[in-house]
Design a protein with these regions (language model features):
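C-terminal boundary/linker of central alpha/beta nucleotide-binding cores
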Residues: 1-71, 81
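Extended alpha-helical scaffolding segments used for macromolecular assembly and cargo binding
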Residues: 76-161, 165-170
Length: 170
C-alpha cells in the first residue's frame, strides 16, 4: 500500500475500463487533479501505459489486480456507479457500443433501452444496428412491443440480417 488514498481510489475507479483518456479519467473518478495523477503514474510507475498522448491503459496484470481489489473494497452500488459514469462518458462521445457495454455491466437496463430507442429513431443509414444487435436481441419481446421505436429498430435489424419474416413480425 505504497500509494496514498487519493491515488489508490483513482486507480480503482479506472480499473473497469480497458482504456481511457484524460477526460474519461476526470469524469469517471470525479477527480479534478486527474491529469496530475496520470502524469505522476506515468513518471514514477510502470503500471500505466499509453498508445499515444491521449489513450491510456493499465498493464494487463496490474489491471487484473486492480479489478480484484475493486471487487473487494467497493460495494456493488459503487461499482455500478462507476460503470454508469463510464457509460455516460461514452454516450456523450456518441460511442454507443461502449456506452451500452458499460450500462449493461452496471445493470442500468433503463439506459440500455433509452439508447436503443434513440438509435432506432435515427435515419436508418445513421443507426448503429450491427454494434447494437446483441442489445436489441436481449430485450424482452413485451418491452419491444411497448415501444414503436424499438419495434422499428428490430424490424430494421431483422431486415439488415436478411430475416424478412422477423422484420415483418416487428
Amino acid at each position: 500500500r505504497r500509494f496514498d488514498l487519493p491515488v489508490r481510489r483513482f486507480l480503482l475507479e479506472l480499473a473497469p475500463f480497458e482504456s481511457f483518456d484524460l477526460e474519461m479519467a476526470r469524469m469517471v473518478s470525479g477527480d479534478p487533479r486527474a491529469g496530475e495523477r496520470l502524469d505522476w503514474l506515468l513518471r514514477y510507475t510502470t503500471m500505466l501505459r499509453y498508445d499515444d498522448c491521449q489513450c491510456f491503459h493499465f498493464w494487463s496484470g496490474f489491471r487484473a489486480f486492480l479489478r480484484w481489489e475493486m471487487d473487494r473494497e467497493y460495494t456493488e452500488e459503487k461499482r455500478k456507479a462507476l460503470f454508469s459514469r463510464g457509460g455516460l462518458y461514452y454516450e456523450l462521445k456518441e460511442d454507443y457500443a461502449h456506452a451500452l457495454e458499460c450500462y449493461t455491466s452496471g445493470g442500468d437496463h433503463a439506459k440500455v433501452s433509452e439508447l436503443l430507442i434513440r438509435n432506432a429513431e435515427l435515419h436508418p443509414g445513421m443507426g448503429h444496428y450491427a454494434e447494437m444487435e446483441q442489445y436489441y436481441r436481449a430485450l424482452p419481446g413485451a418491452e419491444i412491443l411497448a415501444s414503436p421505436s424499438l419495434m422499428q429498430g428490430m424490424s430494421m435489424l431483422c431486415a439488415l440480417s436478411a430475416d424478412y419474416d422477423g422484420s415483418e413480425h416487428w
